[in-house]
């Protein structure tokens, strides 16, 4: 378990740092907001296409082997992401190759890194009774969020030493985690008689409502993540150390999400239905405050509210999907969920960033409306109220 938790922590480190550093780097390289988003969107397409197959593969061949493959892909992608920028800066590589190579680095992450999450969460589902799964998922997810908290800070410090340093460090960390998982986690592939003869359909009544919820939430979250750097740069460029402000915003988001996840699943022990409806209402309010913010303090307050809402709905939705499935479909269910999580990053360059360019407030108001629609969807769809026993 330690190495699986460390794996999510390591992936969170790299992911949050990349989100924080790409917008200012894109500006320095002369890339537009849409080009910067496109770097992430192709990776998201690759992730969406491969997540469910990796989940099925973890059911068949074991959680450990598939998770290791994901860590290796993550490590490779971190190196490929920074290498073209470094070489172009040294006039070794033509600037014309930088954008395609950035896309390549993130695409590798999408193709292989997508194996980590379904394998890891399916392993947790394997060893956890249904009654404790929401709490367990929340605590497990907290390791990833802790990584997103530390990533911009640690990465920013290492970046002061060298542009290569944070990417090399995060890459090595991924390899170390892969080795730790290999030597400590027993691989238990299914017996031939246990392998399901049919696939778990995305359209199954116990699956599609959770996927719809995750898809809409993904669009709202991705549009925020990819616009934070640009929003602060465009609206508060009179403030000093804008890069530190961007990193601090991600830190606030991560801290509030971690605290929310552990508080509402452990201390208050709210059920999934309450977590979802309260969380959606808080997210709706956060986006409206964000759209109306005219000071950095107000914007930070909206980010904290957003983290609280995310901390409630994420573990509730993922555990709800897991609880509704039979044991032999845990990997595939986690894979289906993983396949829709990148939808936001796919659609953001097409839908969100053009809206942001037109008017950033409209983007956040639109996200608030979508979160309220999710609230209505949860209230009226019976599956979110249904309780599955162990």
Locate each region found by the language model.
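Hydrophobic core of transmembrane alpha-helices in multi-pass small-molecule transporters
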Residues: 9, 92-115, 298-312
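Central cavity-lining transmembrane alpha-helices of secondary-active solute carriers
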Residues: 38-56, 248-260
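Helix-loop boundary and gating motifs at the non-cytosolic
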Residues: 1-44, 209, 213, 218-237
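Juxtamembrane intracellular "pre-TM" segments in multi-pass secondary transporters
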Residues: 186-213
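Cytoplasmic helix-loop-helix junction between adjacent transmembrane helices
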Residues: 105-144
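Helix-to-loop junctions at the C-terminal end of transmembrane segments
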Residues: 50-63, 259-272, 356
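C-terminal ends and interior cores of transmembrane alpha-helices
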Residues: 72-95, 282-294
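Intracellular juxtamembrane helix-capping segments at the cytosolic ends
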Residues: 22, 115-128, 312-326
């Amino acid at each position: 378990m330690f190495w699986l938790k460390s794996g999510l922590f390591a992936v969170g480190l790299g992911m949050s740092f990349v989100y924080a550093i790409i917008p200012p780097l894109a500006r320095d390289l002369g890339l537009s907001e849409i080009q910067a988003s496109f770097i992430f969107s192709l990776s998201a397409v690759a992730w969406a296409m491969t997540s469910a197959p990796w989940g099925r593969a973890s059911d068949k061949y074991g959680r450990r082997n598939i998770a290791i493959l994901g860590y290796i892909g993550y490590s490779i992608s971190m190196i490929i992401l920074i290498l073209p920028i470094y070489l172009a800066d040294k006039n070794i590589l033509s600037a014309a190759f930088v954008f395609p190579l950035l896309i390549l680095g993130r695409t590798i992450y999408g193709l292989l890194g997508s194996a980590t999450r379904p394998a890891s969460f399916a392993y947790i589902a394997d060893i956890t009774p249904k009654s404790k799964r929401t709490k367990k998922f929340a605590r497990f997810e907290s390791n990833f969020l802790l990584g997103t908290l530390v990533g911009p800070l640690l990465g920013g410090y290492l970046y002061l030493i060298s542009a290569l340093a944070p990417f090399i460090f995060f890459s090595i960390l991924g390899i170390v985690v892969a080795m730790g998982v290999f030597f400590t986690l027993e691989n238990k592939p299914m017996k031939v008689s246990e392998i399901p003869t049919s696939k778990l359909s995305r359209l199954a009544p116990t699956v599609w409502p959770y996927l719809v919820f995750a898809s809409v939430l993904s669009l709202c979250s991705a549009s925020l993540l990819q616009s934070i750097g640009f929003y602060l740069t465009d609206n508060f460029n009179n403030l000093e150390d804008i890069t530190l402000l961007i990193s601090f915003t991600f830190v606030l988001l991560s801290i509030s999400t971690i605290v929310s996840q552990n508080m509402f699943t452990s201390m208050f022990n709210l059920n999934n239905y309450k977590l979802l409806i309260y969380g959606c209402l808080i997210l709706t309010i956060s986006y409206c405050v964000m759209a109306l913010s005219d000071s950095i303090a107000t914007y930070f307050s909206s980010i904290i509210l957003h983290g609280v809402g995310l901390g409630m709905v994420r573990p509730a939705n993922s555990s709800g999907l897991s609880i509704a499935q039979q044991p032999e479909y845990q990997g595939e269910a986690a894979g289906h969920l993983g396949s829709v999580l990148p939808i936001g990053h796919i659609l953001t360059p097409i839908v969100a960033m053009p809206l942001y360019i037109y008017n950033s407030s409209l983007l956040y108001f639109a996200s608030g409306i979508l979160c309220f629609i999710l609230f209505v969807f949860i209230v009226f769809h019976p599956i979110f109220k249904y309780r599955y026993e162990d």
